[in-house]
Amino acid sequence: KLYYAPMNRYLWLYAAIYLAGTWFSVTRAGSLLGGVLTVAFILFAVILENSITTRRQLDTLLLLLVMAGTAVALYGICQYLFGWGYQSAAWADSEMFGDVFRVPSTLENPNMLGQYLILAIPLGGAGLLAAKDWGMRVFYFCCCGVMCVCMLLTLSRGAWLGLLFAGFVFVLFLQPRLLLLTPLLLVGLYFVLPDAVINRFASIGNLGDSSTSYRVYIWMGTLAMLKDYWMCGIGPGDAAFNLVYPKYSYSGIVAPHAHNLFLQIVCDAGVVALVVFVLLLFHYFRDLCAAFCREKDPFSRLYQTAAVSGIAGFLVQAMTDYSFYNYRVLLLFWAWLALGALLARRGQLPERGLKV
């Protein structure tokens, strides 16, 4: 018997709409692989949600996710120290920032690495606050430190904004009064962070930066395209996007996607898909917030907060990039939704499985 979280009906509906969008794509052959993979990853959330049956399994999964995030971040730091890996000229405006090195780690793109770390860092923070002995506190502190350093090295402004918002939500849930210290924290960071990071952050919204103006032109072209295709979209994948978008592009800008998750969902499967996606997220957040309010166990409350803040921060960065373009990030997003659904009912799970 499958367990159904409140969001699951919308999850199934979203998968069905996305499959229909794939079938009716302007280029079915070009959309088929990406569309089917996306549907499979969406439904993986249901599988994961029903595979974890005890609190011990769930807690072990949480620990493994923090360790995996730390390993990925550590590899990214090594890339920076030893100059490993590929660097693309499209990742930064060389005229504004010079010859900067942005770490992609195993995600092949620093923005996608930032998306992943936004999900992982709140789990590490929850583990740090929930730890009951100094050994585990030091362990989680080191994990959080490694992931935060790697986040800085991505030089991803969207990811930084997403992480700041995730931190805001995290503190808002647990100790709202600490938000009064935010101005002092920001001033302190100004004196501690390297100039490269400060300059990069200060350039947010500067249309003189080619990557910013590039995104704005893509959004304008995408909105112009959606005036004609808002109902059913054009189908998922860059093949469908590149078949239609060039007719609407501004300044001849070439792009594989809309550089905005919400715009891209409408491109892939129409406005109904976006409405269902928003409803899915609404039920995800509502379920976790309700569980947080009635939960008495501090451990569960901490990780429920991490699940809310991680996805909230992820969605902030998703406004500046198409997060699901990288299939690993796509799979992780749906896995995190399943994780949130599990954490919402952690108190109802048995401590261990029944012995047979």
Which residues does each PLM region occupy?
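Membrane-interface helix caps and helix-loop-helix hairpins in membrane proteins
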Residues: 23-32, 152-153, 319-324
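Membrane-interface micro-motifs in multi-pass membrane enzymes
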Residues: 33-34, 105-117, 237, 266-270, ...
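Transmembrane alpha-helices of multi-pass inner-membrane enzymes
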Residues: 179-184, 299, 303-356
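Long extracytoplasmic/lumenal interhelical loops at the membrane interface
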Residues: 198, 205-220, 224, 228, ...
